[in-house]
């Protein structure tokens, strides 16, 4: 893999992470608005619910990023195997 490809993948991954972070932030704001309307903002249960919701959102983000990276690794492995077999078939004597 060339250096440029690695840089582009890194920047793309960071961009996806920023989008996911923005989505989590937006969900958190909606959730906090709902909780502030239904629960007292300084109550113990408000803090507990907020912490659990944050953990679940970050867990979903982590699992999604792991899934995306595994799919990318599988695709790269399959491409490498195809390229290897293509090189071997081209170099074999006829």
Curated annotation (Swiss-Prot):
GO cellular component: host cell cytoplasm; membrane; viral envelope; virion membrane
All ranges on the Intravirion side of the membrane: 23-45
Topology term for the membrane: Single-pass membrane protein
Signal peptide span: 1-22
Chain intervals with Polar residues compositional bias: 85-94
InterPro entries for the chain: Poxvirus_A9
Mitochondrion keyword on record: no
Protein name: Virion membrane protein OPG135
Organism (species): Vaccinia virus (strain Ankara)
Originating gene: OPG135
